[in-house]
Amino acid sequence: MKKIYADSEKGKTNPLVKTVWESKIKQTPSKNKHISYSSISTYNKCPKLWELQYLRKAVPFRQNIYTCFGTAMHETMQTWLETMYHDKVKTANEMDKHQLLYDNMIKAYRSGKAQNGHEHFTTSDELNMFWLEGKHILDFLEKKRAAYFSTKNMKLAGIETLLYQEIKPGIMFKGLVDLIFYHPNTGRWSVVDIKTSTSGWRDNQKKNPNLTA
């Protein structure tokens, strides 16, 4: 497995950082029944849809351009950040992130098409439009990198970290945390959930500490 930090930094790093990072390898979901945030969200919006989709399996989830783009952007950002924190900032800056996003979108599209019974769910023009928007997002993140993802006072502790907790006997909650950072100067942790959207955030959402803290 790739080293988390240089040997010279081992003494400075909270051992929990290593524990969190390796949890995605060590945790293996059991065969117990589990629920996810997606299923809870679906139930809150429409119990009938939840019944048809999760209980009766009568309405299978279908991939679309938004899930395709979201998956590709997640993977691109996570690869970029892992390179930045676990290798070098210079190496991350030299990555062709535009090409990486394109490759990830094609991979996500092919996977989604297979899940949809090999039916096309978008067009080449739409894929290209989303890719162009994604390039702007990546350029913005690189420009603001030091403000959002400082390598001086933050350590990347987790990517796609598995949450698998019993909430009732025999019922588990299963979820994945996009990014977990450790702040050695304060001993605090921060969790980042990557979201892609065409609508952006309203002012009240930006000020909601439960969404931005």
PLM-predicted stretches and their roles:
Residues 61-65, 69, 122, 126, ...:
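Conserved aromatic-histidine-acidic binding/catalytic patches
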Residues 2-13, 25, 96-99, 110, ...:
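Metal-dependent nuclease catalytic regions and adjoining charged, substrate-binding loops involved
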Residues 76-159:
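A non-catalytic, helix-rich entry segment at domain boundaries
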Residues 47-60, 116-117, 191, 197-201:
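Short amphipathic alpha-helical segments and their helix-coil junctions
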Residues 35, 68-72, 129, 174, ...:
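Generic recognition of stable, solvent-exposed alpha-helical segments in well-folded globular domains
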Residues 1-67:
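C-terminal, charged and often intrinsically disordered regions of DNA end-processing helicases
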